[in-house]
UniProtKB/Swiss-Prot annotation:
Pathway: Amino-acid biosynthesis; L-leucine biosynthesis; L-leucine from 3-methyl-2-oxobutanoate: step 2/4. HAMAP family: LeuD_type1. The keyword Transport does not apply. One of its GO terms (biological process) is L-leucine biosynthetic process. Catalyzes the isomerization between 2-isopropylmalate and 3-isopropylmalate, via the formation of 2-isopropylmaleate. GO terms for cellular component: 3-isopropylmalate dehydratase complex. Gene3D superfamilies: Aconitase, domain 4. Belongs to the LeuD family. LeuD type 1 subfamily. The keyword Amino-acid biosynthesis applies. Heterodimer of LeuC and LeuD. This is 3-isopropylmalate dehydratase small subunit. Keywords: Amino-acid biosynthesis, Branched-chain amino acid biosynthesis, Leucine biosynthesis, Lyase.
Amino acid sequence: MSGFQQHTGLVVPLDAANVDTDAIIPKQFLQKVNRTGFGKHLFHDWRFLDDAGEKANPEFVMNQPRYQDASILLARENFGCGSSREHAPWALADYGIRVMIAPSFADIFYGNSINNQMVPVRLTEQEVDELFTYVHDTEGATITVDLEALSVTANGKTYHFEIDDFRRHCLLNGLDNIGLTLQHEAKIAEYEAKIPSFLK
């Protein structure tokens, strides 16, 4: 995986609190276990007016022309609540979302997002309100997120966020659980070489 240092992107404002993982990716699309192909089903029941996903809902924010190709999702509190399905961050990432900004995220969803190289940014409710106003009032509104500086810059103003050092290290260096393990490949090989043959 490639690391995340800084990203500037178009913002889509999802003005809803307590968005759960079943809304992000409904259960009927969970049959696959690889990470790709879920983006087309993201927010299926909100984006589409039919079960086949062929008739777009023009009222849903992600279908509006001004928000096409957005890579930053702005949301309200407790985003990603509900079941722990990792398909939710898979769908967001496959759709093209790199950063999510909200006052709070469900704990498991927060960790799963980082494991999939997306940056969940927690700002205060007041700061998120300011960003919603900026995005609503400004067509083509962009935000820059700098993971090195732990900053969010929008409309000439800079906000700061926190993320623990270990998770920040993983994001900066593009490390998931497998990547972290492979950092110790030499020690693993050394250990395996010492295992008696009857245990192999």
